[in-house]
Structures are given as C-alpha cells and as structure tokens.
C-alpha cells in the first residue's frame, strides 16, 4: 500500500482542505465531508497538493498510510465530481419508482420493498428498470447500492434480480430430464 500512499493528491479548482488534529474537512462545489484519520499519519496541505506521510516503515503504518491516502482522495473526488452507482433490474414485472426520497421496488415478492435514502445519498430512476445511487461519500453510495442489490440479488439460472450495470452473472445449466 505504500506506493499508493506516496502519491500526491492534486486538488481541483474550488476544493479546499482543512486539517485540524487529523480531523480533515474537505469542502467543494458538491458539498462538505469530514473524517477523522489516525493520529500517527501526517497530512500536509501545500497549495493545491496534499501529501500523506508515515512515521516509520512498520507493516501497520504502511497499510494505514495507503488507506488514508485513498480515503482522502475519495473525499476530494466526491466533493468535486461525486459518485454514482448504476443498477439494473431483470425479471418480469420488476420495477422501481420514486416516492419522495424513498425508492419503492417491485421485485417479485408479495409486498413492495421500500428503501429510505440515507443522508447524503439520492436515488434516480431514469427508466422503471434502472436505478442510479448518487452521492458525495463513496462509502455510503457503495453500501446503499449493495443493500438495494441484496433485496433481490441475481440468481444463476435465469439471471433475474437486481445487478450492477455491466456486472457478469455466472449462469448455471438447469436440471436435465431423463
């Protein structure tokens, strides 16, 4: 991970970082994110460049170093561009619709599943079988998309279910009759 940690993060225009006792706040055009990092890791901001340093070369510090740099970079990308996960639904009668900030899913159950959007995450339904999960925090966007997918994950025989756009679902052959 140390190779990732040694890379410098370049700040895009309109993004500023405030570091106070390793509680980092990143402000940008799309919003503001705050996160606390390990106190042993040094985060220095010089103009439009951010560097992450570690005190020694122990295995633990190397891993924390790379993870800190990756998380900080995700915060910078989130407040400047944002993150989006696209999901698609396959199956007869599988539909999604928005009711306010709630996502209502009909996925072949006796009832409809309702998913409340967590703070900082929004849903978009361009077509009844496509769902976009949008936000500035990469972690919460990914977790929300994974939760929506888990409501009806794709099954291997017909491929019905909710999947990420571009996700390959391994198919199985059905039973062969005698």
Curated annotation (Swiss-Prot):
Gene3D superfamilies with a match to the protein in the record: Ribosomal protein L6, alpha-beta domain (3.90.930.12)
Keywords: Ribonucleoprotein, Ribosomal protein, RNA-binding, rRNA-binding
Disulfide bonds: none
Alphabetical list of Pfam families matching this protein: Ribosomal_L6
GO molecular function: rRNA binding; structural constituent of ribosome
SUPFAM superfamilies: Ribosomal protein L6 (SSF56053)
Keyword Phosphoprotein recorded: no
Domain of life of the organism encoding this protein: Bacteria
Gene Ontology biological process terms from the UniProt entry: cytoplasmic translation
Gene Ontology CC, one term: cytosolic large ribosomal subunit
Family: Belongs to the universal ribosomal protein uL6 family.
NCBIfam families found in the cross-reference section: L6_bact (TIGR03654)
Role: This protein binds to the 23S rRNA, and is important in its secondary structure. It is located near the subunit interface in the base of the L7/L12 stalk, and near the tRNA binding site of the peptidyltransferase center.
Subunit structure: Part of the 50S ribosomal subunit.
Name of this chain's protein: Large ribosomal subunit protein uL6
Source species of the chain: Streptococcus agalactiae serotype Ia (strain ATCC 27591 / A909 / CDC SS700)
Gene this chain is encoded by: rplF
């Amino acid at each position: 991970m140390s190779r990732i940690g040694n890379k410098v993060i370049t700040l895009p225009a309109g993004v500023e970082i405030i570091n106070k006792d390793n509680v980092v706040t990143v402000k940008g055009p799309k919003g503001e994110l705050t996160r606390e990092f390990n106190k042993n890791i040094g985060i220095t901001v010089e103009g439009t460049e951010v560097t992450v340093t570690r005190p020694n070369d122990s295995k633990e510090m190397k891993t924390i170093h790379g993870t800190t740099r990756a998380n900080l970079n995700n915060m910078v990308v989130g407040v400047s561009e944002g993150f989006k996960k696209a999901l698609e639904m396959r199956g007869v009668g599988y539909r999604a619709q928005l009711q306010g900030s709630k996502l209502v899913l009909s996925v072949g159950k006796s009832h409809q599943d309702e998913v409340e959007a967590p703070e900082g995450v929004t849903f978009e339904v361009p077509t009844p079988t496509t769902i976009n999960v949008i936000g500035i925090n990469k972690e919460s966007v990914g977790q929300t998309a994974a939760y929506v997918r888990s409501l009806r994950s794709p099954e291997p025989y017909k491929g019905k279910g909710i999947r990420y756009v571009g996700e390959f679902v391994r198919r199985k052959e059905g039973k062969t009759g005698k």
